[in-house]
């Protein structure tokens, strides 16, 4: 019986060990078989070319990721979505993308709704937003806007920005007739006077330049309330399976960040983004006139950035934009995030 028991035990250990080895093989194979990196970006362009602004346009124009992974035969696929954050979250849920450059609310909604994403890098901070109104409307403050028709792109960073701006003035969305329009539709509706106002980014300055809108309020006027943070997030499955690839991607991104955070490159940056996005250069020049690129585009997930991002999570929860609040520090990918660069 002893011999039989020992033999059975030996076979059991051998079978278990073999199962462990075989079970690990798919994981090892997967880790070694990265053929393509799929990156999602909200498309901010008004023309036929794609633009994500910020670090994305620098990365693509210089083919930084493509060059970084060329020696491994890994292709980089950029996917631009006009539907912005909500559509990108769907792509994450369907396993169609590995990374995404997103504004704060879209990334927060995805995480809160159960998407397994990891926070890898800051990509912008303190980005201004504007209130655009019909010329001659007499609207000078957010208080003046009560009861009016305001276009906001729901599910995007602009919605959270709007809510934060309102909260700073003791207001909420309930005080207005909020209409969900994407950025292009909102600009068209405001120009046609089909709405009273729109909350959005520098694209509203194009209407101002044409005399089709006034911009009485910006987040700068509100002491920064409503300014936007942007991030790079990665699929949890990809990050866990390919930490070396993620590490290499973040280090390659720093090449773009180092160029972008040099204030002397502001004119070149304006020219780059304007060309890709089909915006008149004066729009971005006006938007960035009093701004320092060195303050907008650092990639570190420092305590100040994480604190503001946590504030965004808390506000989104208070405004019932998300169901489950969470700790931003638990979202950060350990040992890989830009905090360690």
What would you call each of these model-derived segments?
Residues 36, 46-76, 112-113, 308-311:
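Short, polar/charged alpha-helical segment
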Residues 45-50, 240-321:
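Secondary-structure end/capping motifs
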Residues 105, 179, 185-276:
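Pocket-lining segment of extracytoplasmic ligand-binding domains
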Residues 78-90, 103, 176-191:
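Short helix-initiation/N-cap motifs at beta->coil->alpha
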Residues 41-43, 129-139, 228-244:
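A bilobed periplasmic-binding-protein/Venus flytrap-type ligand-binding module shared by bacterial periplasmic
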Residues 310-341:
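Conserved C-terminal helix/tail region of periplasmic/extracytoplasmic solute-binding proteins
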